[in-house]
Amino acid sequence: MREILHIQGGQCGNQIGAKFWEVICGEHGIDQTGQSCGDTDLQLERINVYFNEASGGKYVPRAVLMDLEPGTMDSLRSGPFGQIFRPDNFVFGQSGAGNNWAKGHYTEGAELIDSVLDVVRKEAENCDCLQGFQVCHSLGGGTGSGMGTLLISKIREEYPDRMMMTFSVFPSPKVSDTVVEPYNATLSVHQLVENADECMVLDNEALYDICFRTLKLANPTFGDLNHLISATMSGVTCCLRFPGQLNSDLRKLAVNLIPFPRLHFFMVGFAPLTSRGSQQYSALSVPELTQQMWDAKNMMCAADPRHGRYLTASAVFRGKMSTKEVDEQMMNVQNKNSSYFVEWIPNNVKSSVCDIAPTGLKMASTFIGNSTSIQEMFRRVSEQFTAMFRRKAFLHWYTGEGMDEMEFTEAESNMNDLVAEYQQYQDATVGEEEYEEDEEEEEA
């Protein structure tokens, strides 16, 4: 079985993770004690991807939970699914990272990291054939960003050939939780570019917009936002967990989505977007799903795909539907909007179909796109970073933990290079390619 090891870090990561496990347990018919109460064999057929079977037929999530302060973990443990996790897999410190990336990456986090790695090793040894890791974290705080990226680089060293997928919550353009978000996010992206295989980019503002605009929720909570994220997370891996006509796994996803190794930041979407109450009315058709899925308003990060071009995209459909219709609809999208796809990657949209729809829906689809417009996110963070860094504002919090200014400069230029790379491929056409390559050789 191709297992996935799930790791959640920091407050944001743990809250998203908690929601995610609620969704996964629901899909596989696992109750709050870890017993199976499902109605079909399909739910248990490949349950090993995310669960370990313990004694007495109890299913235990393959999850590692870490944080530098006990608060979030305590509330998670006393929450509805708190008893399902393996108690040893909660790893937490007492001091907190105080929204400081350096604390998470170099001081506090570095002290805790070995105990986290021990748990990761133990879980990895329990796997038949570990496919990879998925990490939930935010990039604006201290633990998820600093310690999260530290863990990713350590896992990269130890398991170089396993896939590393992250669900990363970026700082939002207008809603800011902490002043130093741009620092933390830039330092994190610097790490993610090098050490992660695929990053699903999320941000709270886009999620709020979906809640207001599409779901018509008057005052959305983080619970509602995390609900959206977990629907997408479940969609990305449903092909591994349920039988389907066209399967994909983390590696197939990466091969189809990443034309150049550094450009592995994806925007994700989900359809049908219905608020939690009104689910039973939405019987959608494949064309409607497709249309909603490609809609710019449904993207879960604050970048507009219409401002760039898709290098590649992938769609996972769930439910009983004809693959022929799926293929027709996807071709249809590409033909009608050909200007939004780079023409030097023909057939750059991959679709997969999984027969089992998510709980409470007839059919659904998850969208993962590699669009050059994601540079808007990086550009925005980079501008805020530069504004503060030029004045060396707040820098003493980081240098006090032993960081060097040089590291900031490197992270800044890595982020700017990334933006430039996206821009280069956005502007590239079929004819220009040879000419650009010659130029690069001359420069080199």
Swiss-Prot record:
> GO molecular function of the protein, one example?
structural constituent of cytoskeleton
Q: Where in the cell is it found?
A: Cytoplasm, Cytoskeleton
A single GO cellular-component term from the record reads: plant-type vacuole
- Assigned keywords, A-Z: Cytoplasm, Cytoskeleton, GTP-binding, Magnesium, Metal-binding, Microtubule, Nucleotide-binding
Cofactor dependency: Mg(2+)
Q: Per UniProt, where does GTP bind?
A: 11, 69, 138, 142-144, 204, 226
Q: Which cysteines are joined by disulfide bonds?
A: none
The family note in this entry says: Belongs to the tubulin family.
Could you identify this protein by its name?
A: Tubulin beta-9 chain
Organism, as annotated = Arabidopsis thaliana
